[in-house]
Design a protein with these regions (language model features):
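Gly/Ala-rich beta-loop-alpha elbow adjacent to hydrolase catalytic centers
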Residues: 55-65
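Short loop/helix-cap segments at secondary-structure boundaries that form the rim of catalytic
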Residues: 19, 63-69
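Short hydrophobic segments within beta-strands
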Residues: 2-6, 55, 148-150
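The alpha/beta-hydrolase serine catalytic core
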Residues: 71-73, 77-202
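Residue in the alpha/beta-hydrolase core beta-strand immediately N-terminal to the catalytic nucleophile
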Residues: 52-55, 71-73
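Generic recognition of short, well-ordered alpha-helical segments
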Residues: 13, 37-41, 67, 160, ...
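Active-site catalytic motif of lipid deacylating hydrolases and related acyltransferases
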Residues: 1-49
């Protein structure tokens, strides 16, 4: 089961590569930007699919962490994004700001996650992150977790993606590679796919 990032969807690039390259069934479904609505969607999908592995990408990593009992791979984990959403939430109270954010972050064409930046939705991400991090190894989480973080990820500068944050909560269970936030295909094939096979065989 693949959980896409913000503005992604069922036709996102990485799960499409995985579906073509792997002998396993890869399922990626478009979910709500509202984390409370998405939580219910994820619970139903896990019950239906009974996945052997969950892969989270970027903001989707927080959803992945909340689904216990299944090994996980996190790609470009944006674990600190909710802290920025907290600040953005207050800005959306200014008339016109929500419309500006909606235009700036408008998803690509296709089956993509609709984005609507409202105070109510953005404020929910604080609780969402808190619940996700309860599953960390530091807090007693038992699920196998491995992350892939690109050293050229532009979100490292703002710490939205943070190697330090990841290691604080999950230890050294991560692979650093010379790639960007979007994880180029060569790294999907050379790093992520072997790890998927390793976890599923284990």
């Amino acid at each position: 089961m693949y959980i896409h990032g913000m503005g992604g969807g069922s036709d996102s690039r990485i799960p499409s590569i995985l579906a073509e390259a792997l002998p396993y069934k890869v399922v990626c479904r478009t979910y709500s930007f509202d984390p409370e609505v998405a939580e219910k969607q994820m619970a139903l999908w896990v019950e239906e699919l009974k996945p052997d592995l969950i892969i989270g990408e970027s903001l989707g990593c927080l959803h992945a962490l909340r689904l216990s009992g299944v090994p996980k791979i996190l790609i470009s984990p944006a674990l600190n994004a909710p802290q920025y959403f907290e600040a953005l939430a207050w800005l959306t109270l200014v008339p016109g700001v929500t419309s500006i954010f909606n235009r700036i972050y408008k998803p690509r064409e296709g089956d993509r996650q609709p984005l609507h930046f409202t105070f109510r939705t953005l404020r929910k991400y604080r609780r969402h992150r808190k619940l996700a991090m309860k599953a960390s190894h530091r807090n007693g989480g038992q699920d196998a977790v491995h992350a892939f973080i690109g050293t050229r990820d532009h979100y490292l500068r703002s710490a939205i993606v943070s190697t330090r944050t990841y290691k604080k909560h999950f230890g050294a269970t991560c692979t650093l590679y010379d790639g960007s936030h979007f994880t180029e295909e060569e790294y999907i094939r050379s790093l992520v796919i072997p790890k998927i096979k390793e976890l599923l065989k284990g």
